[in-house]
Amino acid sequence: RMTHDDKHLIMDDGTATLTYLDPTTLKPVKKVQVYDDKDAMVYINELEYSEGYIYANVWTTNLIVKIDPETGKVLAKIDLDGILSMTNSGKQVDVLNGIAIDPATKKMYVTGKYYPKLFEIKLVKKE
């Protein structure tokens, strides 16, 4: 549950807090609270840094949030409800819990505990 930018390791602890660590000493440098327009965004989990933003799964939900790393503000919510219905696997699955972004192609991949597949998704702006 860690990612990095060019300067720091960035870690979540399952709450709304992102902790920035010095990569050499592993000592905390700063903490940022993640929030949306209503309240603190708790259960932040599974971080991925890409193109100046942090993407995080919200534990036990089908949401991925796009976070401003400086302020902690949630800039977008990506709702993946229904993604499993595309598999028709009939197997028991647990929760969304995997995000990866290929830096070369900018493609996002998501999966979860006991998911039968890895999904490649394309992000589009909601109109």
Locations of the language-model features?
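Beta-propeller fold detector
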Residues: V29-V34, L75-G82
